[in-house]
Design a protein with these regions (language model features):
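A structural "domain/chain start" motif
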Residues: 22-87, 198-208
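C-terminal motif of bacterial Sec signal peptides marking the signal peptidase cleavage site
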Residues: 17-20
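Second-shell loop/turn segments in exported
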Residues: 73-84, 103-104, 173-181
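Extracytoplasmic/secreted envelope proteins and their assembly/folding machinery
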Residues: 86, 90, 94, 101, ...
């Protein structure tokens, strides 16, 4: 018993020293966006741009398939995990846009926007950081993700909105271990933020 407690204590100490101040993945500039000139810094982990006329003039949206642009010497995910993350993000985007009042379509048009999103970095949760609940609460072993996304006029290609952001996962999900849980937590946080942005824009009175 003493030996087991000693091992757990060492694991917790290692978690504290190696990952106690877990940070979000780095934001990237991969060239995925059509332009980066419109972006303005919001925080250390977020830059964004949104055209004032987007909500008023566009009522439909084409949602391109989410891309994964993660470059690593060693594979970060299996093919199944990759598909799982893409499908999870795709479903989240469709919910956000539908709830915001946009009709999801497949053909370009004058009142139709195009949404493009890419995951540009992924940090899977590490098993050693989940050996003890205390280590997870301190951020050890916490994963996350970063992304780039933009909304374009589906006909002209004009950028209507864009964002680059990074997010680490939840430190409080202690029920079970899944290396992609924190990536999905990041996706959920981005979806929630996007929903708030659209709600705020629709709440503003139209000018003129």
């Amino acid at each position: 018993m003493v030996r087991i407690l000693g091992i757990l204590s060492l694991a917790l100490l290692a978690a504290t020293l190696l990952g106690g101040c877990a940070k979000a993945p780095k934001m990237t500039n991969t060239g995925f966006l059509s332009t980066y000139d419109n972006l303005e810094k919001v925080s250390e982990n977020r830059t964004k741009y949104m055209s004032g006329d987007f909500v008023a003039k566009y009522h439909k949206v084409i949602i391109n398939r989410v891309q994964v642009l993660v470059h690593s010497e060693k594979p970060i995910m299996t093919a199944q995990e990759r598909d799982d993350v893409i499908n999870y993000f795709q479903a989240a985007l469709e919910r956000v846009m539908t709830n915001a009042g946009f009709e999801v379509v497949t053909e370009p048009g004058p009142d139709t926007a195009r949404l493009r999103v890419a995951i540009t970095d992924i940090q899977k949760s590490s098993f050693w950081g989940n050996l003890h609940p205390g280590s997870k609460l301190m951020g050890a072993g916490t994963g996350g993700a970063s992304m780039e996304g933009e909304i374009l006029d589906s006909v002209t290609g004009r950028q209507l909105g864009a964002v680059i952001q990074a997010k680490k996962g939840s430190q409080f999900d202690l029920e079970y271990f899944d290396g992609l849980d924190d990536v999905k937590d990041a996706i959920n946080a981005w979806a929630k933020q996007a929903s708030k942005t659209f709600e705020s824009m629709r709440a503003k009175p139209e000018s003129g």
